[in-house]
Amino acid sequence: MDKRKYTVIDLFAGCGGLSLGLYQAGWNGVFAVEKNPCAFETLNYNLIENKNHFDWPEWLPKEPLDIIEVNKRYRKELKHLRGTIDLVAGGPPCQGFSMAGKRVEDDVRNQLVFAYIDFIKMVRPKLILFENVKGFTYAFDKRKHPDAVPYSKVVIEKLQMLGYNVKPQIIDFSQFGIPQRRKRFILVGIRNGLKGCADVFFEKLESEKKGFLEKRGLAEKVTIVDAISDLLRSNGEIETPDRKGFLSGLYGNEQTAYQHYLRSDSINIIPNSHSFAHHTKEKESCFENLLLNYPIRGKRIDGENRAPWGIRQRGITVLDPNAVAPTITGLPDDYLHYSEPRIMTVRECARIQSFPDWYEFKSKYTTGGKLRKKEVPRYSQVGNAIPPLFAFQAGLVLKELTNG
């Protein structure tokens, strides 16, 4: 058994998807930086209070933290960590880069990229695991700014200047046992002078995934029905413990290896965050009609196609049970359940993101209006996360690189 202690700091940790996967792979957290109180509440409950994943230094408060403030306030302490940190993991929030939303060039969140580089410069970890949306590799409007370069190029050049051998790649998480088409920019860096090169990470990740999944009884390709068929509303309902006036679904029997894997360590009788949305009769009737009559599954109903089907919202996708899901976002109204006239629950989204059922989400379920800029409710926490099952696989490969 490997008794070596592998140390990691998680930046922009969100609700903890990356930290969870690294924890499962045997990494020991030093601390995590997450600014949003909603996401931090989930991270704190699952991995700080209850799993003791983090050693957490006395000089750093266990509370929501802004990386820019951490860099300013604790420069001396961060520099003292040099030589003790194996890995700095994480990537800045995606809203400023994502192709799914409006790309905002002067978005203050984009400044977080440079705070990330500053942090790396101070701590000098052996390894870097950087994750972001695919849109991170695209420059802003070339017509307005002919000299614009993508942020990915900036990060790569800055890390190389700091003395890291880096390798970026676009990864589709559906190729790693996760029931979701989710393409992300992944960059691995190894500090110059250490054995190995960053290219090896992606080679090993690919060559070792089959054995990893087989060892856990999991398939490489997992469909939506494989992930959530035990969470049907028809299993029965009960009052939601943490959401007054709403009903939650009960567990059905495990039907797949994927369900067994994610349920195996849960002691919950009622699935956490499996609370059903309130739909008007008009909307429920619209959903029933779509399930019965709409001919195409897994493709967004958008634009002029909406009106004939009574869709008033911006668009919706009727999920195909026998395919992987589209990219899970923070907006619950994007997807219609494959067999029931309702949107997906937080727990169903979490299953598709590969969170185990023991992992409990905290704070509000949804938000809206101006609060959307401040709050990160449960749906958004799940939609923003790195799938733990991928992070688990990445964590095992990174341990190999640490050992040379």
Which residues make up each language-model segment?
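Short, well-ordered loop/turn elements at secondary-structure boundaries
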Residues: 27, 181-182, 321-324
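A generic secondary-structure signal for well-formed alpha-helical elements
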Residues: 47, 92, 137-140, 159-163, ...
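Class I S-adenosyl-L-methionine
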Residues: 74-82, 97-306
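Short, solvent-exposed loop/turn segments at secondary-structure junctions
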Residues: 16, 38, 93-95, 134-135, ...
